[in-house]
Amino acid sequence: MHPGPQPNGLQAAEDGLWAIDQGNNHLYKLDWQDGSVLEDLPTETDRSSGVTIGGGNIWIASTYTAELFKCNMDGTTVERYDTPGKGGVAFANTPNPRTTGAHGMEWIDDENMWVAVPPAQKVFLMDPSTMTVKRSIPTPGIRPHGLFMHEGAMWLADTAACKVHKLDPADGTVLAEVDVPAPEVHGMTLHGGNMWFCCAEPRRVCTVPLPE
């Protein structure tokens, strides 16, 4: 059971699993073995849905402010940036949904960071040193969420479709797909050859082997 009310983004690290909570906007580091809380960091984000680590910083997708936060390793804010592709989502239950921003994030290196943005149905490749967009690829579903890179391919969760898609990051071509019928897939990361994903409503963090 996740310690917060609604886990929504994950990022693997050698010393623990980072999880951002959409309910209380706290960032937790969890022990890989028993899920115990190693760190509990409050943040200034709102309805956070994604997290990644890189360049000595924590990066968080603040979904309801449609911003990307650059934070210190203690969770305090360094800078906040506008989210590319922000807007209303296609899966909303209202005719005029509020403007929201990014979900999944994945740091690659000092010049490359992927950001999944459901309103745009795209994953943007950004330069974290300038926070400018380099290019983007389309998503196969309407609700892209967590993502990670492995052996040159992108693995992208889609919460609405209950699937994880393996994509060519050059153009978004679907190379394979994995059904995740229950309970739901939100944030996602890779550790020890396994996919780890979080389920917001049941407050679960789950893991399955990465398909061949």
Predicted regions, residues:
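Beta-rich, blade/repeat-based domains predominating
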Residues: 2-14, 44-55, 85-110, 140-151, ...
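Short loop/turn segments that connect beta-strands within beta-propeller blades
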Residues: 31-35, 72-76, 127-131, 168-172, ...
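Beta-propeller domains
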Residues: 22-32
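Short coil/turn linkers that define WD40 beta-propeller blade boundaries
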Residues: 25, 35, 66, 75-76, ...
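Conserved beta-strand positions in repeat-built beta-propeller and related beta-rich domains
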Residues: 19-24, 60-65, 115-120, 156-161, ...
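A short beta-strand motif characteristic of beta-propeller blades
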Residues: 1, 36-41, 77-81, 86-95, ...
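Ankyrin-repeat and related helical/solenoid repeat scaffolds used for protein-protein interactions
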Residues: 148-196
